A protein has these predicted regions:
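Internal "kinase-insert"/substrate-recognition segments embedded within catalytic cores
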Residues: 220-226, 240-241, 261-266, 278-377
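Conserved NTP-binding catalytic cores of kinases and kinase-like/nucleotidyltransferase enzymes
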Residues: 150-248, 252
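A conserved helix-loop-beta module that forms one wall/lid of the active-site cleft
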Residues: 242-276
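Middle-to-C-terminal accessory/interaction subdomains
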Residues: 168-170, 196, 208, 212, ...
Length: 537
């Protein structure tokens, strides 16, 4: 996907007084800004647009008269109000007593003149939103509307070619093999680079997924690179999604995470992978979870800690809390004894506070409640079987700070793709995160948190706030499937598992379309169930 917004600056306007936009009316003579003529040309030609970027002093737009008719334009924003109206309404435009346009009750000092031709008019207000129309309000009363043209649906998703130096498959999760990676994206689906190549090391990754025929991989480049306009780093992952026959559950969960606003959401894109010349299907290429300034941005050297909750207990330092939560040090992976003692005491104190008779007065000093609420929403909405503080959960603890659910990970057996909940309910029904803790039903952190009326009130308020954004996820899923084009068909030619049970599928269908339809059906039903139940708490 082409990068949609490089910078999100909501306001590019010079304010010199509380009642007007722009400079003093005494010396300001309205005129068309530099670059506006190309916007006029694009509007007259009926062009849509595919890319937009905003800086403090200009707007740059890639218009599209069609797939093969690129037309770019850049315009100065001097004396123009511009805002991102995602999730909000544009400001009201009106005319003041002097006959000048006002935006949101503030005068622009630009006269309204309906006699002006579009070619003579002056822009004074611009609104935009991701994936929506771009609107330019001009002084003759017209609004130039440019439809969003989504070129992500054209062409093929990127191809990733992995070649090991020994030309053999990858059999180990511990030992890296050396080799080369080549990424080809001639259709510019997700970045402007057509081809990237580098030397690398590669090994297997994952727990249960490593035991499946289609293997997931961990890649470490010899030099840092900013792949697919993600973070600049050496370490990357290829998720196989073997048991997720929709191929988009992890992608969908990260989109929900992005909308909820977690401190970090791992970026992911779908790709097709070739290993030593053999086609291996559709994978999800993503940022590896790690501490860095562009990923988990904490200061380990200063005493901050990244923890993982994981029953596998496969890190160097692991322990179970007094209430049965399986903790591990993720970074630092070899903590000092002082850090170990501090961490164990912190969780002991937190759980003691949480199970205290007057817990509502004390537990909040240990946790960042907002992140715990968002974690509950995404894990409960997806009914992620691993999300009940049992596996693949990540928390940060800043020195002298509060415990934060920093990011989420691993959703391939969520959203109707699990058959072992053990609650006897359909996958879109029943509480999971709220009631089913890591140490059994009615015994976990969230079970106690929901005994606090204030916590419940905050959950309900947050749910009402994000519910409209969650309602549009099905359309996002359908778009993501369209972006992949014919790649899923090739994937299931390589892996002939449609119509066959793969652990832990709740439902087995006979086509890719039916797999996507099941994901959409389950998500829609779960969202409706959640909305009813959360508001009734």
């Amino acid at each position: 996907m082409k990068q949609f917004f490089k910078t999100l600056l909501l306001l590019a306007v010079l304010m010199t007084g509380c009642d007007q936009i722009g400079p003093s009316a005494d010396n300001y003579k309205p005129k068309q800004p530099e670059g506006f003529s190309r916007f006029q040309t694009a509007y007259a030609a009926g062009y849509g647009y595919s890319e937009l970027s905003v800086s403090s002093d200009s707007i740059r737009v890639a218009f599209d008269g069609g797939p093969n008719q690129p037309f770019t334009a850049a315009m100065s924003l001097e004396h123009i109000l511009i805002e991102d109206v995602s999730g909000a309404s544009p400001k009201i435009t009106a005319v003041d007593s002097q006959g000048c346009w006002m935006v949101g009750g503030v005068s622009t000092k630009i006269p309204k003149d309906e006699k002006l031709l579009d070619s003579q008019a002056i822009p004074f207000y611009i609104t935009y939103a991701e994936g929506a129309d771009l609107r330019v309000y001009v002084s003759n009363g017209n609004v130039f509307v440019y439809k969003f043209y989504d070129n992500r649906f054209e062409g093929e998703i990127p191809k990733v070619y992995l070649t090991t130096d020994d030309r053999q498959d990858i059999y180990s999760k511990e030992e890296y093999k050396t080799g080369k990676i080549v990424i080809k994206d001639p259709d510019h689906k997700f970045w402007k680079t057509e081809e990237f190549s580098a030397t690398m090391r590669i090994r297997g990754r994952g727990n249960s997924t490593w035991g499946m025929p289609k293997k997931p991989y961990k890649i470490k480049l010899d030099e840092k690179a900013r792949l697919f306009d993600m973070s600049s780093d050496k370490e990357w992952c290829l998720l196989a999604n073997y048991c997720d026959k929709s191929l988009v559950r992890n992608l969908t969960a990260m989109e929900i995470s992005r909308r909820l606003g977690f401190s970090w959401t791992p970026k992911m894109v779908p790709v097709e992978v070739y290993l030593n010349g053999r086609y291996d299907g559709v994978y999800t290429f993503c940022e590896h979870k790690k501490v860095s300034s562009e990923r988990v941005d904490i200061d380990v050297d200063a005493g901050d800690i990244l923890f993982e909750i994981e029953q596998q207990q496969d890190e160097i330092v692991c322990w179970w809390t007094d209430h049965g939560c399986p903790m591990m040090f993720s970074d630092p992976d070899e903590p000092t004894q002082e850090q170990i003692d501090f961490a164990k005491q912190f969780f002991r104190d937190f759980e003691t506070a949480l199970w205290n008779k007057e817990f509502t007065k004390v537990y909040s000093q240990y946790i960042d409640k907002a992140s715990f609420i968002d974690y509950f929403i995404i894990q409960e909405l997806t009914k992620n079987v691993d999300g009940n503080l049992r596996k693949s959960s990540y928390l940060t603890l800043p020195k002298d700070g509060k415990l934060e659910m920093y990011f989420v990970w691993d959703f391939d057996i969520s959203m109707g793709n699990c058959d072992y909940y053990g609650d006897g309910l359909k996958p879109w029904e029943g509480w999971w995160i709220k009631d089913q803790g890591c140490n059994g039903r009615y015994h976990g952190w969230y079970y106690r948190l929901f005994m606090d009326p204030n916590f419940v009130s905050e959950v309900k308020a947050r749910w009402k706030e994000v519910y409209p954004q969650l309602q549009t996820i099905p359309q996002w899923i359908e778009d993501e499937v369209k972006i992949m084009g014919a790649a899923p068909e090739r994937n299931f030619e390589r892996w002939n598992i449609l119509g066959i049970y793969v652990w832990p599928n709740y439902k087995v269908t006979g086509s890719y379309k039916a797999e996507v339809d099941w994901l959409l059906e389950n998500y829609t039903k779960r969202l409706a169930w959640m909305n009813t139940q959360v508001l009734a708490l």
